Amino acid sequence: DQGAGVTYLEPSASQIGHKESIKDTARVLGRMYDGIEYRGFGQDVVEELAKYAGVPVFNGLTNEFHPTQMFADALTMREHSGKPLNQTAFAYVGDARYNMANSLLVLGAKLGMDVRIGAPKTLWPSENIVARARAVAEETGGKILLTENAEEAVKGADFIHTDVWVSMGEPKEAWQERIDLLKDYRVTPELMAASGNPQVKFMHCLPAFHNRETKVGEWIYETFGLNGVEVT
C-alpha cells in the first residue's frame, strides 16, 4: 500500500540453513533489500539474520516470540481500555509455552501492566522467560501472576487473551492430550463473567477454533463433541 518493493521467499524458494548458511543468506539479502521480515520457527534463525544482514530485521513470528503481534495487541488494549496501559490488567489462559504467551508476558512486563497467566503448570512459560519478565517488571512496576486457576487469572482483568491449543505442523494425536489438559481453560461466557468486569474484552491473534465452520472445527466436533475449542 505504501509503494514499497516486496519479495516473498517461501520455504521451498530458499536454502537458508539447508544448503546455504544463515549468515550467507543474511549478507546477500542485506545487500539487496532495505529490510527483512522473518516468519518461521527458530528464534536463533531470526537473531542470526539480524546479526549479519546489516539492515533492519523484523521478527514476524517464531516458536518463541511474536513481537509484531504485540504492537497490534498493545495498540488495541490502549484504544479499548480507556486507561493507560500501566493501569491495565490482562490474562492469558490456555497453553502458555509458546510465542503468544511468552510475548504477552514480556510486553506486559515492559509496559508495567498487570499480567496473569492461567494454565496447567506443565504448560507454563519457561522459567528463563518468566525470570527475565519478572526482572523487567520490578523496574517498570508491572505485576506477574502465574496460576493453575483460570478464574483467579481473569479476576479483575480488562482483557482476556488465548491462542490455539494445537499449532501448525503438530499431529492430530496432540488434540486429545491438549483437550484433556486445557478443557478447564476454555474462554466461555462464564469465564468472561468470572472477571467481575462487565467491560472485559476478549482477544485472540487468530485463527481461532470457535465453531464448526472449518474442516478442523467440524472434525473436532465429530471426534470430541466440542463446538469450539479454546473459545466458545
From Swiss-Prot:
Q: Which domain of life is it from?
A: Bacteria
Q: Which GO terms describe its cellular component?
A: cytoplasm
- One GO term of the biological process aspect: citrulline biosynthetic process
Molecular function GO terms recorded? amino acid binding; ornithine carbamoyltransferase activity
| Protein name, entry field | Ornithine carbamoyltransferase
Pathway membership, UniProt: Amino-acid biosynthesis; L-arginine biosynthesis; L-arginine from L-ornithine and carbamoyl phosphate: step 1/3
Give the function comment from the record. Reversibly catalyzes the transfer of the carbamoyl group from carbamoyl phosphate (CP) to the N(epsilon) atom of ornithine (ORN) to produce L-citrulline.
Q: For binding L-ornithine, which residues are annotated in this chain's numbering?
A: 99, 163, 167-168
Originating organism:
Neisseria flava
